[in-house]
Amino acid sequence: MEEENATLLTEFVLTGFLYQPQWKIPLFLAFLVIYLITIMGNLGLIAVIWKDPHLHIPMYLLLGNLAFVDALLSSSVTLKMLINFLAKSKMISLSECKIQLFSFAISVTTECFLLATMAYDRYVAICKPLLYPAIMTNGLCIRLLILSYVGGLLHALIHEGFLFRLTFCNSNIIQHFYCDIIPLLKISYTDSSINFLMVFIFAGSIQVFTIGTVLISYIFVLYTILKKKSVKGMRKAFSTCGAHLLSVSLYYGPLAFMYMGSASPQADDQDMMESLFYTVIVPLLNPMIYSLRNKQVIASFTKMFKRNDV
């Protein structure tokens, strides 16, 4: 009876970051610049790969899709944050919240699978170089890409489905700068223990599987590199894997800490700085990490601009 008489909430307040009023415009401009650079960098990388037929190979097909997912991840979070910097009210409707959570969950999960697939690609390239063209074909790459997106979609649908069993009546204040699953569950009027369990099981399983794939791949890669007698060969192998290892470390570090450490009703509020790092900063850095020392990408980028000038 109490639940029936309670007023259902359909709007929420995103608290966002705490800052002095005079910092509102500088913060808005800073995040706007970051977002624009992120979108230009990732879409630029996609354009370079799309335009150059020489880059239509598994390594760059995976990189192009990573850039697409990074652009989606950044957009799903940053656009609403930019609006809230200037808006008097930081309200978000329940439907908007679910849409944001859905797009966020798809992009985050898909990126996990993509990073694992890229690690496998590096394993085959370094440990089985002669068999690489036969094993890592474009057909296999496309199938792995489809599985990555399907995995992201299913994971998002699971959490969206379980959200429909919840009602929100008491508090409408989300202690975050976007609609993330954990802060939303914490203000649920309905018992959200099952939802927390689903987060722990599915998010945990995905992270264990993808991180495990990355670790196992690089254990074999490291073993193969150490067997190489040529210093030049070792440098080339490290150069091939360095960018991906850095990207994986930056992405999985805060992500694993947040979702494996906070998926319980008693856990403290999420550290928003950790969320900011992997939703805003990592998508900004990835195009630079993968492009600046990649001679093929730089050469293709230069060619594309020369053609445009002509």
From Swiss-Prot:
Which regions face the Cytoplasmic side of the membrane?
50-56, 120-143, 217-240, 293-310
Listed disulfide bonds for this chain?
97-179
Kindly give the membrane topology term recorded for this protein.
Multi-pass membrane protein
Record InterPro entries: GPCR_Rhodpsn, GPCR_Rhodpsn_7TM, Olfact_rcpt
Where do transmembrane segments lie in this chain?
29-49, 57-77, 99-119, 144-164, 196-216, 241-261, 272-292
Identify the keywords attached in UniProt to this record, alphabetized. Answer: Cell membrane, Disulfide bond, G-protein coupled receptor, Glycoprotein, Membrane, Olfaction, Receptor, Sensory transduction, Transducer, Transmembrane, Transmembrane helix
Coiled-coil residue windows = none
Q: Name one GO cellular component term.
A: plasma membrane
Q: Which Pfam families match?
A: 7tm_4
Extracellular compartment segments: 1-28, 78-98, 165-195, 262-271
Q: What does this protein do?
A: Odorant receptor.
The family classification in the record reads: Belongs to the G-protein coupled receptor 1 family.
**Protein known as:** Olfactory receptor 5H14
